UniProtKB/Swiss-Prot annotation:
NCBIfam families: PRK09355.1 (NF006830), thiM (TIGR00694). This is Hydroxyethylthiazole kinase. ATP binds at R122, S168. GO terms for molecular function: ATP binding; hydroxyethylthiazole kinase activity; magnesium ion binding.
Amino acid sequence: MPHTEHIWRNVDAVRRQAPLVHSITNFVVMNVTANALLAAGASPIMAHAREEMAELVNIVSSLVLNIGTLSAPWIDSMFLAGAAAHERGIPVVLDPVGAGASTLRTTTAAQLMERVRPAIVRGNGSEIMALAGAAGATRGVDSTRDAHAAADSARALSRRHHCVTVVSGPVDLVTDGDEEVLITGGHELMPRVTGMGCTATVLVAAHAAVAASPLEGAVSGMAAMSAAGSMAAERAAGPGSFAMHFIDALYALSEADIRARVRVGRP
């Protein structure tokens, strides 16, 4: 199981190596997630044109596929980039935003799992349950299920697709179908700011680019997210100032912060 030293090693490696993270992501969060990657020490690129997917995959360190604002051309680009990245051994992280809320979202996410075979999928409880085929309530892109409720679905998804599944919430669950890790930290202000889940996904992608395994990358990315959320909340007066302080916290994050603010353990 990844421990604090592994988490810090990956935080430091992201800062030293500046992995290039390619995000095919949604309009709502492009600026938010690009700034988060920069603050963490990674380098973002947000490109969607299918004509350049093959070229870009040759130079990136990891790939994020985020289905938040889907359209047919973007779906084509996701399949092209995802297949090329998988073939080259580049870690792909899928964010199935709103899976279960519409047929398009659910079907696209399921097809990406089958055809792209991402190394990691990160979603909230409702999204993971929907992707695993469980009956779960989804209200837009917001979760009505926590990690505990989605644990069986997460394990099943990981075993079926040979991937790491991350269920984010007040307590985050990371599993590869056999090993399970719980991450406790963060703050209740985090779901009051748009793009926090999508930010978790890009941080996981940055860490996956430098980590020893997808499981370790997922755990360390989520732990960094939780620690920064806790730090930001101490200075924030509300959601607006939290968003600003969160970026600063990612930039300033230290090993001592991780040790003091995040608990990583088994269920």
